[in-house]
A protein has these predicted regions:
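Aspartate-rich (DDxxD/NDxxD/DxxxD) Mg2+/diphosphate-binding motifs
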Residues: 1-20
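Hydrophobic alpha-helical transmembrane segments
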Residues: 5, 21-162
């Protein structure tokens, strides 16, 4: 779906109205997350703490987008300066700390493969973004977080029920 050219894709992404693909993607993702999280809460002791680990880990993985891709729009078109500015070493250190600290607090070996798969998903998304729009936008940042989090939960669920 969407546009065939980079310019058309960016134009569609700038439109604040949600389309059929957006609605369908959100509904399918939330239904999938609901079912996977429900299954994990029943299968894992302390399953309620899972989002305390998964959320920061996946935000850390998806935030690495700024290290792999340039901002796709002109800086003057960005709504938030933070989106197109590369983080400093202090901000990177904070991102790592806030991403890894909860995982270290509730460490389980069963989180390693899901985290690796979430990182692989993020890298695949970055490759698609590079090919389609030669960079990223704020929408891309949000989508990469949602997808990496879903991949984390799905992988963990598959490991529990395999």
């Amino acid at each position: 779906g969407g546009g065939t050219s980079r310019e058309r894709v960016l134009e569609i992404m700038k439109d604040s109205h949600i389309g059929t693909y957006g609605v369908l993607g959100l509904v399918v993702n939330y239904l999938l997350q609901w079912n996977v999280l429900t299954a994990l809460m029943q299968a894992l002791p302390g399953g309620a703490m899972l989002s305390v680990v998964a959320d920061p880990l996946c935000k850390m993985a998806s935030s690495s987008i700024v290290h792999f891709l340039p901002y796709a729009r002109k800086a003057s078109e960005a709504k938030i300066k933070m989106v197109y500015t590369r983080p400093s070493w202090r901000e990177n250190a904070a991102c790592l700390a806030f991403g890894l600290l909860p995982a270290a607090s509730f460490f389980s070996m069963s989180y390693i493969l899901p985290f690796v798969m979430a990182c692989v998903a993020a890298l695949c998304l970055f490759a698609i973004m590079r090919r389609r729009i030669q960079g990223y936008t704020g929408d891309c940042c949000g989508a990469s977080f949602i997808i990496t989090e879903t991949v984390f939960y799905l992988t963990l669920c598959l490991l529990q029920y395999a």
